[in-house]
Amino acid sequence: MFFMEITLDQLLASREERASFQKELLKGYPGKTLVCLTVIMPGKVKRNLQSLVVAQAAVTALVSAFGDSMLKFRLRDLPTGYEAYLVTPLSNEEAKKETCRIEDTHPLGRLFDLDVIDADGVPMSRESVGLSPRKCLVCDNEARYCMRNRTHTMAELTAKIDEMIESYVR
């Protein structure tokens, strides 16, 4: 395990590569649903002991929820973070509801970024299945509002993540 800082260019390149990988999976499984996991880990170090704990918890939750219906599962350990992909015959809507249930009920679920990718490579929104947007890790505002406005300091975010993980591993 290494704790290497990544650059913005690396992060942006990893997003492009992830989108390309998702399109390849979708092409290989036409008519099926793709679920993609990334770990929410603010800062320049995306791969550390905390992100490993979160990724393992998320993978366990995904396998528990989708295990019998998984057609393919792939885990990737990259300098830009852990990623997992699963293909299921469930509808996009069924899969999105299940991933939202995991995010909303698992003790570390707020640190899971579980996307359901449609046939065009576009992630489905929570609102598309009648759910409200994700809440901020620190306060009760919408997460996207706090992210866009940089409402919380890195120290506040890190403290909250530390607290969540510490509580989970106890």
Predicted features by range, described:
Residues F2-G67, D77-P79, E94-R170:
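Long, contiguous binding/interaction regions
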Residues Y82-L90:
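Short cationic amphipathic helices and targeting signals
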Residues S69-F73:
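Short beta-strand elements
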